[in-house]
Amino acid sequence: MSVRLGIVMDPIERISYKKDSSLAMLLAAQDRGWTLFYMEQKDLYQNAGQARARMKPLKVFADPAKWFEFEAEIDAGLDDLDVILMRKDPPFDMEFIYTTYLLEQAESAGVLVVNKPQSLRDCNEKLFATLFPQCTPPTLVSRRADILREFAEQQGDVILKPLDGMGGASIFRHRAGDPNLSVILETLTAHGTQQIMAQGYLPAIKDGDKRILMVDGEPVPYCLARIPAAGETRGNLAAGGRGEARPLSDKDRWIAEQIGPTLREKGLLFVGLDVIGEHLTEINVTSPTCIREIDNAFGTNIGGLLMDAIEKKLQARKG
């Protein structure tokens, strides 16, 4: 099948060759003979009602010294592409939202966008998880200090975090008797002006925060456990955690079964579930990672699984 695949991502020259999941996807697409086109947010624009971009034909290589090569930039409508991977990392700011509007125009013109632009806007990675209370720890979302304090007192040991953070930034643990709850709440809620999340602390974090990758609603059979550094409560690799690939547990598969149908319904083809012990904590939809670590440990080809799912959807559209 001849496919023209575009990708919107952060600068490719700055990625980590060893760890970057977008590169794994591009290599898998190129292995199928698909034609690749590279874009950054700044390259997207709209003219006369058409979403367009200054895009560069791209070749990628499994070579840590040289992993990409551009051809001459072209100016084309996004509807010249069959599929676009939206792989721009957070922050989830207004520029991110404007990008989804432009991609939504391409989608209306017949392009498959992964993940679906509307769902990228709708599915906040922390709030989305609360739609599955059977899977999550005790969870509260509020900006009122009295409501948050009451929850903290009931739980005794809680994690407090912003709704828009990534990489473990601004995550606090509060235990009964700690004197600093007021300043934590003031800081995170910006003196009561921003909603935050509080969750019951999960001691199982010591054994790792598991990243489970979902491809079109089905779990990859292995996960990456991100184990906190000594003295830390955050498993995020960006916060100093280390990764350890593992097979999924029965509970992991059960959680995936609870969430999979909703992901398919919302056009979320590639998603990362964060699970601590037996509890779902977040659903990452913007630019999930950990493909390379799992592939290297178990010989999987997760990028290939995603391309299979994309090809299936493109064939279904063509009838």
UniProtKB/Swiss-Prot annotation:
Cofactor note: Binds 1 Mg(2+) or Mn(2+) ion per subunit.
E.C. designation(s): 6.3.2.3
Annotated keywords: ATP-binding, Glutathione biosynthesis, Ligase, Magnesium, Manganese, Metal-binding, Nucleotide-binding
Amino-acid positions noted as binding ATP in the UniProt annotation, renumbered to this chain: 151-208
InterPro entries: ATP-grasp, ATP_grasp_subdomain_1, Glut_synth_pro, GSHS_ATP-bd, GSHS_N, PreATP-grasp_dom_sf
PANTHER family per record: GLUTATHIONE SYNTHETASE (PTHR21621:SF4), RIBOSOMAL PROTEIN S6 MODIFICATION PROTEIN (PTHR21621)
Entry similarity comment: Belongs to the prokaryotic GSH synthase family.
Name under which the protein is recorded: Glutathione synthetase
Species in which this protein is naturally found: Pseudomonas syringae pv. tomato (strain ATCC BAA-871 / DC3000)
